Amino acid sequence: MRALEENGVADNTLVIFTSDNGPGYCGSPGGLRGRKGQSYEGGFRVPMIAHWPKEITAKSICSEPAMNIDLFPTLLSLAGVDLPEDRVIDGKNILSLLTSNGKRDPSDCLFFYHNKELEAVRMGKWKYIRDIDTMAWPIPLDKHWKSENSLEAPWLYNLELDPGESYNLRREHPDIVEAMEAIFQKWQKSMKENLGGWK
């Protein structure tokens, strides 16, 4: 930041500070459930700080969900570069979330993986976790980790009311479970058919 200021370009330079996942074996997920390697919010939800005085109001807060894969199309747009057309781009341009009170399209889905395995999907306030047993090492390295009861699967959470993912609502909302499972299956099928991301 000092170098940007000394060269007189700090006001019109976008600086982003974020992380790729929640804490691993140490640190705190800030009251959220889960850690790195799990599809709970504590494993994925991280802060992002964007500094761009010319375009972003100081101390403004955006609570809309986004993912690191959204940075690629956003930065290309800012640079005036078209997205490549020879491959599928999973991210969305989130410039309106950074510079104004924009909202993410409520039909947008966020997909959560552990290694190559699709584990969960989020759409709006709903989070659907279908499988969280993919990190079941023979000896868990994280003292906070515990195996989940597969009889409770799948898991459905209302993140607006339950950001700590404490109450599985699958029995109360079978229609939402069915809709989320359909989204899950469709996405998984598209990924297997197009493993390299090429059209």
Tell me what each language-model feature is.
Residues 36, 40-41, 112-170:
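C-terminal, low-complexity/hydrophilic appendages and adjacent surface loops
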Residues 1-6, 32-88, 92-104:
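Substrate-binding rim/cap in mid-to-C-terminal beta-strand-loop elements of soluble/periplasmic
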Residues 10, 27, 41-45, 66-69, ...:
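Short, solvent-exposed loop/turn segments at the edges of secondary structure
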Residues 1-29:
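Metal-dependent active-site segment of extracytoplasmic phospho-/sulfohydrolases and closely related
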Residues 14-18, 48-51, 73-77, 109-113, ...:
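Structural recognition of the beta-strand scaffold that forms the well-ordered cores
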Residues 1, 5, 72-76, 95, ...:
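Non-transmembrane alpha-helical segments in soluble domains
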Residues 22-28, 100-107, 192:
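Secretory-pathway/luminal and periplasmic proteins that interact with or process carbohydrate-rich
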